[in-house]
Amino acid sequence: MGPFWISTPPTIPSSDGTPSSVFTPSEWVKEISVSMLRRFDLHTHSFFSKDACNSPEELIAAAVRRGLDGIAITDHDSCEAHDYLRGRELPPGFLVVPGVEVSTAEGHLLCIGATLPMMKGRPAREVLQAIKDAGGVAIPAHPFDKWRAGIRPNFLDTLDIEVLEVFNAAVTSRRYNDQALEYARRRGLKSTGASDAHHDSAVGVSTTVFEMEELTVPALLEALRKGGRPEGRYLTFREGLKKHFGNWFRIFNRRPDRNPK
């Protein structure tokens, strides 16, 4: 028997923070080739976000060390990282996915597979349409997390979305991930897991595994719409401290170097 592909979101236990190695009923599972499995972290932040400090290259290097096939750099209301990387040499066999985390009027919305003009503060429906027009996929980030500008369920109900982030490694309470997973199941949405890394040590803590024949942005977007398997764990207490407090000193000292000559 070969490896398995979970075509329906797995149950993610909140007791130990590990959503991987989850068994599902046999009717949810099919056998596939290992060569088609690709692992992505679709929610990361570089020093082009005000609350993060690592360069795009450092995020990429961390992802490569951890065996990922690609990342989406989704800075807050900024696509500068992708302009920054244009023309720079990237690791072979690794995909950097365009993206941005937009602070809409109703909460945070990820754009995956495309870049956008500045849309901070615009209505979520308007941003959602802009993402679709740009050819990307819209994913509400850390929904239900009221302390981190997650879009609340009563408004989520009105959004024409296909995918939901059901496991965010940095949520302020694990119940928010449980609620997101239940909501995705109820609406029949596809699921993702991501680190929401604001420093390179958190990259790849949580990821999504996809079935893909090609390592390209169009293939990833197609796989997103078909559905992936969230994997990984929550940030440790130490990692959480680094995210919320330790970064500020590093940001103060690193941000002037973000455009090295």
Annotate the PLM regions:
Residues 4-21, 26-28:
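Low-acidity, Ser/Thr- and Arg-rich intrinsically disordered low-complexity segments
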Residues 23-52, 56-61, 80-86, 91-98, ...:
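Charged catalytic cores and adjacent phosphate/nucleic-acid-binding surfaces used
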Residues 43, 132-140:
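Acidic/glycine-enriched edge-of-secondary-structure segments
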Residues 59-80, 137-139:
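Divalent metal-dependent hydrolysis catalytic cores, especially in the metallo-beta-lactamase
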Residues 75, 142, 195:
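Glycine-rich, histidine-containing beta strand-loop boundary motifs that form or position
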Residues 121-124, 141:
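Ordered, amphipathic secondary-structure segments that act as subunit-interaction surfaces
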Residues 139-147:
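Aromatic-lined carbohydrate-recognition surfaces of secreted/lumenal glycan-active proteins
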